[in-house]
């Protein structure tokens, strides 16, 4: 599990794309020229950006070779670059940096966010959406199973928090619009929840385990999910999924 699995990731494409659509709707920019899609994945968000600004020069950035290959296949006329978000440098100032469900994987947001703002043109916008589910049962149980089975902690860090991001970006010279939304996804089974998180949040926990260790982990994880997520009257499961949204406009 050294690289992302585009097919597994796309299994819930509609649910994953909805936050990108809603983030994009809050970006009030017109006639812009340079856009970067950070953590572009399979190119779903890049396609949305092209629809909104067809004349703009858009660059999709992702560190996953598999994701970049999928994006290039889906959008052959677009520019995609395999690179680390932290190290990538654009050739010109950017009018929009769009980062949908990517920056949560990177550490040191107190340094990362001001760095990204520095890449913007005057009045440019940094638009960010990050899953804020570190305290949700899906992610708490990952840590509990790992502790039970004596596996090292592989999970990502929790987000800095609403007030911290507001201060970070305000001090970086931005006007900040920040909000948090909880989606309730209808899941047909507990296995469907596992399928969802295996493509994203569960990846770091499984990547260094043998096949038998992975199966042992997932069996116990499934048992614990059944305890935490009861069935609705119609047999569905409601999976709460909080997400943090930020639209920061550079004022300098």
From Swiss-Prot:
It is found in: Cytoplasm. It catalyses: trans-aconitate + S-adenosyl-L-methionine = (E)-3-(methoxycarbonyl)pent-2-enedioate + S-adenosyl-L-homocysteine. One of its GO terms (molecular function) is trans-aconitate 2-methyltransferase activity. Its EC number is 2.1.1.144. Gene3D superfamilies: S-adenosyl-L-methionine-dependent methyltransferases (1.10.150.290), Vaccinia Virus protein VP39 (3.40.50.150). SUPFAM superfamilies: S-adenosyl-L-methionine-dependent methyltransferases. Its main location: cytoplasm. Pfam families: Methyltransf_25. One of its GO terms (biological process) is methylation. It comes from the Bacteria. InterPro entries: Methyltransf_25 (IPR041698), SAM-dependent_MTases_sf (IPR029063), Trans-aconitate_MeTrfase (IPR023506), Trans_acon_MeTrfase_C (IPR023149). It is an enzyme of class 2 (transferase). GO terms for cellular component: cytoplasm. Transmembrane segments: none annotated. Keywords: Cytoplasm, Methyltransferase, S-adenosyl-L-methionine, Transferase. Signal peptide: none annotated. Catalyzes the S-adenosylmethionine monomethyl esterification of trans-aconitate. Belongs to the methyltransferase superfamily. Tam family. This is Trans-aconitate 2-methyltransferase. It comes from Escherichia coli O1:K1 / APEC. The lineage of its organism: Bacteria, Pseudomonadati, Pseudomonadota, Gammaproteobacteria, Enterobacterales.
């Amino acid at each position: 599990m050294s690289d992302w699995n585009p097919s597994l990731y796309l299994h819930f494409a509609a649910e994953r794309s909805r936050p990108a659509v809603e983030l994009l709707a809050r970006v009030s920019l017109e006639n812009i020229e340079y856009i970067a899609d950070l953590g572009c994945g399979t190119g779903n968000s890049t396609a949305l950006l092209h629809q909104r600004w067809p004349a703009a020069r858009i660059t999709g950035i992702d560190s996953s070779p598999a994701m970049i290959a999928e994006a290039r296949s889906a959008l052959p006329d677009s520019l995609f670059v395999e690179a680390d978000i932290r190290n990538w440098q654009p050739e010109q100032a950017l009018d929009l940096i769009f980062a949908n469900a990517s920056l949560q994987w990177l550490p040191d947001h107190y340094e990362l966010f001001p760095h990204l703002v520095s890449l913007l043109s005057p009045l440019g916008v940094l638009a960010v959406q990050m899953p804020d589910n570190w305290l949700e049962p899906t992610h708490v149980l990952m840590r509990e199973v790992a502790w039970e089975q004596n596996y090292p902690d592989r999970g990502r860090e929790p987000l800095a928090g609403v007030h911290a991001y507001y201060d970070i970006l305000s001090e970086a010279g931005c006007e900040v619009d920040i909000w948090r939304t909880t989606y309730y996804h209808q899941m047909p089974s507990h296995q469907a929840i596992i399928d969802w998180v295996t493509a994203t949040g569960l990846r770091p926990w499984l990547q260094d385990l043998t096949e038998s260790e992975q199966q042992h982990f997932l069996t116990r994880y499934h048992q614990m999910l059944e305890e935490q997520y009861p069935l609705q009257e119609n047999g569905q499961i409601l999976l709460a999924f909080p997400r943090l949204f930020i639209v920061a406009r550079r004022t300098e």
